[in-house]
Amino acid sequence: MVKLTSIAAGVAAIAATASATTTLAQSDERVNLVELGVYVSDIRAHLAQYYSFQVAHPTETYPVEIAEAVFNYGDFTTMLTGIAPDQVTRMITGVPWYSSRLKPAISSALSKDGIYTIAN
């Protein structure tokens, strides 16, 4: 016979390992901040590649907040609030390495934070 305490302990263990999940619209600011965090980290890691892309595509502009976040190694998330969702999407998907590098990293970061997205 299984004791109630064993069942309770098992349920508690499962609950402790299960992460809370949240479903948000792709344009939600929390989603944008995760995306921008990955983007800033990717720029830092591949700065020369982004410089080359900028030279080849001078009309692709970035908000000043992105540059400030890239070169400020403290907590930059508050700098990135207020960037319009369509601008976030344009910047992130506008680079050739979006599908191979950014998209998987963004998906991983959202999943790690328990965030799942739905189309707007």
Curated annotation (Swiss-Prot):
The keyword Glycoprotein applies. GO terms for biological process: fungal-type cell wall organization. PROSITE patterns: SRP1_TIP1. O-glycosylated. Induction: Induced during anaerobic growth and completely repressed during aerobic growth. It is found in: Secreted, Cell wall. Pfam families: SRP1_TIP1. Keywords: Cell wall, Cell wall biogenesis/degradation, Glycoprotein, Secreted, Signal. GO terms for molecular function: structural constituent of cell wall. Residues 1-20 form the signal peptide. The keyword Methyltransferase does not apply. InterPro entries: SRP1_TIP1 (IPR000992), Yeast_SRP1/TIP1_CWP (IPR050788). One of its GO terms (cellular component) is fungal-type cell wall. Component of the cell wall. Belongs to the SRP1/TIP1 family. Seripauperin subfamily. This is Seripauperin-24.
